Every structure is written in structure tokens, then in C-alpha cells.
Amino acid sequence: MTQAPLTAVISARRPLAPEAMNLFLETAPGPVRWYVDYGEAADYRAAGAVEVIEVGGLVQARNAALADAFAEGRACVQVSDDLRRLRRHSAIGGGAAGLGEVIEAMSVACAETGATLAGLPPTDNEFYTPADPRYRHGVFIVGDLIFVRPSPQRFDRQLRLKEDYDFTVQHDQAAGAVRVQTYLASFAHRDNRGGAVSYRTMEAEAEAIGYLMHKWPGRFRLNGRRPGEILMRRPARRRAA
């Protein structure tokens, strides 16, 4: 792929986010666009976002970014608006990493494995994220920072939460999804107002979990240690005939 990827910042109800995010976005290798809720573009531009598109909610924003990137012959990078730190795993020397460096690592992972979706570990704690092997397959790809090659998969519009679990399985059961273990990211997440936090409740979590377990039998199980959370299972191996 010759075109540099589109970097899409997925945001809503956080109009000051560009002030911090622009420091990371400086190293993005291609165009950068903010995808926000209706009526928010002016506030985001006032805070430093240059290109802003109003598309509605979370899943609508994610799918609009995919459509725009693929129509331009680009891969799509999606990043949440509350990124706080990117760093290299100590196994490859440690230290701060730029967004462009991480995007390149995810792009290479897709090229080397044939996967159409790449991402990073869901935690920046190295105790839970060994760097060997460098790539992991059949595991959850958290949607906070992903690289998506042109492909037919889209985020499920029935989901307002946990849409990245569904998206991971879609890719995993097609060309593949790969997690790059050598880079780590941290996000403000649930301590940050706005975004999905504004409607994340235990009832909404339970509804999303039920939907996912019905749609993908055998691919998820409840997390016994964390109510309202699920764990992704590897696909069952087929028995030889």
C-alpha cells in the first residue's frame, strides 16, 4: 500500500481533547481527521483540531472513518481522544515512542502476517504483556489504537459498548487480527468525562455482553474477576475427520 494511512481521532463531548492530542498527532504519517458528534465541530476546531467531521455516535464515527480511508485507498488508523502515553516495551529498549513509530509497527505486523486488523495490548503493564512472541493472534484487539487495512468488516451498529470485541472477532475469523506486543499505550479511559463514559452503565454493559455471546457462540466468556467484563476465547480447533 503506497498511500499513507488516515489517522482518525474518535471523539465526542470532549472539545478540549485536541490541545493534548495534537502533540501525538504531529508524527502521524498521513492525514489526520477528527470524527465527532453532531454540533461539536466548531468547539473542536477552536481547541486546535484542523479537520473535523460530524458523524454522530461512536460506531457511526468508526465506520465513517473506515469508509473515508478505504475510499482514498488508505489504511485506517483509529485512536481514542484521551491518549496519554506511548512507549516501547523494555524488551526492545523501552522509552517513549511516537505515534508514527507505533503506526508503522502495526502496519508491518499486518504486512508480515496477512492480518487486516492490528492493535496493541489492552494494558501498559509489562507484567501482563510479555513481548515474546512479538505478535499474538486470536486475542482481543482493544479499539483505542488500531490499524485497519482495507477490508469489508465494519463495526456493528447494534453495539454502543464493546464494539471492538465484535470487530476483533470479525477480522479474526476472516484474514486475521494481530496484536503487537512490543509497544504499550495508556489512555485516560473511564476517569475521563465524555465519550462512552457518559452512557456506560452495568445495564448497558450486560446488554452488550449478551448480544456478543449470542452473536459469537463460544468466542467469549464472562470475566469472573471483573463484573461487566468478558474475555475473548480463541476459536475452537477443528478435529481431524
Regions found by a protein language model. Give the residues of each.
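C-terminal catalytic/acceptor-binding lobe
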Residues: 2-6, 13-16, 159-161, 165-241
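Short, solvent-exposed loop/turn segments at secondary-structure junctions
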Residues: 14-15, 41, 82-84, 123-126, ...
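Active-site-proximal specificity loops/subdomain of glycosyltransferases
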Residues: 35-79, 84-99
